[in-house]
């Protein structure tokens, strides 16, 4: 199971009801923060999500409402005794932005590993201490360049699930019992002059979890295959009414109905709308624009928690 907590659902500027863009993914006690807008630390405190186990921060782009909370969070992590490296992922150019932001945080007592997102997937293995970049892993982070007024990327998180041990296969393949546990972890094992593969003891691959996060973009066609069959899509919906579509095009954002159409065309299971313009006092007033297209659409609220279970 994974948990996603919306820490901020506002866009442009904070309001009394909404902090700026941020969400946190929790899997097996390790955490990935997505964006870090103003108010992120306060929302973490209220929701009790904490920041000590954050291994990766994924930044969609460097507009202030998505990143201005980052220097303060980095400082708080350092002041709280963090020594472990922290990975920051973002669009091309994020490295220079991080350098600029950290001018006001001159001392960071841990390593920052900045990855300017490529078109290749990033795989991470997970253990009790951290998430580590590797050639294979339980969590795969995928990115897509979207269309906004600055370089911006959407994220998809594929959480893999290990196949079950298959006793019948292990016996049929005459795999020595002493190496069963090693093979269950994946990879090959050489034993007494013979090479054994993990596929010799494991069953079929099981369905994992797919979570997509899309913000600050026009509804480009490439989004549909990118979010295809996601268990959850969190998608920006800066404008509520269909009559605001010209504003959305001008500012390179989406309306409620455009976000819903992405969800419908992408055959996602659940849609949470976020990144509401400060001009929208109550997003629920406009939810029918989304539900008419995608009935499972919901309004995202600060500190809302969404849990997704593995199936079967």
From Swiss-Prot:
GO molecular function: 3'-tRNA processing endoribonuclease activity; zinc ion binding
Any coiled-coil regions, as ranges: none
Gene3D superfamilies referenced in this protein's UniProt entry, alphabetically: Ribonuclease Z/Hydroxyacylglutathione hydrolase-like
Reactions catalysed according to its record: Endonucleolytic cleavage of RNA, removing extra 3' nucleotides from tRNA precursor, generating 3' termini of tRNAs. A 3'-hydroxy group is left at the tRNA terminus and a 5'-phosphoryl group is left at the trailer molecule
UniProt keyword annotations, A-Z: Endonuclease, Hydrolase, Metal-binding, Nuclease, tRNA processing, Zinc
Name of one Pfam family that matches: Lactamase_B
Cofactor note: Binds 2 Zn(2+) ions.
Cofactor names: Zn(2+)
Active site residues according to the UniProt entry: 65
Transmembrane portions of the chain: none
EC number: 3.1.26.11
Signal peptide: none
Entry binding sites for Zn(2+) 2: 65-66, 216, 275
Annotated positions binding Zn(2+) 1: 61, 63, 148, 216
Entry-linked SUPFAM superfamilies: Metallo-hydrolase/oxidoreductase
Role this protein plays: Zinc phosphodiesterase, which displays some tRNA 3'-processing endonuclease activity. Probably involved in tRNA maturation, by removing a 3'-trailer from precursor tRNA.
Family assignment from sequence similarity: Belongs to the RNase Z family.
Subunit and interaction comment: Homodimer.
Record-given protein name: Ribonuclease Z
Organism: Clostridium tetani (strain Massachusetts / E88)
